[in-house]
């Protein structure tokens, strides 16, 4: 939600290389050994031509081998991943994104030449985003009214808040978004955050 995928796409575009977004749900399997096989097929495909291979939520397959209940399968997956990263052809790039950097295997960290940290947008960025997101929508408030209270939110969360505020006004059959609509949208986002944190803590 902080622009990692967009940054990877721009990187590929600047280099004039094809951009391949790897969907993890197509890699991960409950069958023994199949996840490692799917990873191998992905890297074999990427070796056919110089490209930018992008993994989102990389921690799902690169988690520390000290974690998890099925240590043997986890080791198999991470070991396979380490081998294939080492075999990336010159001219090709691997970019991996995660929100759970503390869970990545230490050996995985050593395979990457560069690490880029993406922070949440600051107040100026929030102000700019709200202004652009709501420019074609009638509002009963100014973006400045909510800038400080939204400084800790990601771009993805800001997008959800704006869309939720629009939805509230539409369901109420009003053409403009009120201050209350936007506050309610922020409260909804806060509750969603809390639920996601609980789910993450229970895993």
Model region roles, listed by residue range:
Residues 123-203:
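C-terminal alpha-helical "lid" subdomain
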